[in-house]
Amino acid sequence: MKRYNIKFKYRDESSNGKWNEQECTIYADSKYAAEKECKKIYGLGIDCEYIIYEVTEII
């Protein structure tokens, strides 16, 4: 498994349209799997808009 750092922005009703930035670090087999796990952990796409703008492998 590799470790990935994922940076994303999200906004929802409680942010009054303002984008908030967040990061997460995930162990996964691929970038795709890391993004999927991050979305699951943070509930991205359920009741918010989001943009994942950077995924980097941590060496």
Which ranges hold each PLM region?
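Short aromatic-glycine-(Arg/Gly/Cys) micro-motifs in beta-strand/loop hairpins
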Residues: 1-21
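Intrinsically disordered, low-complexity boundary segments flanking structured domains
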Residues: 11-13, 37-41
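A short, exposed loop/beta-hairpin motif centered on an aromatic-Gly-Thr core
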Residues: 19-30
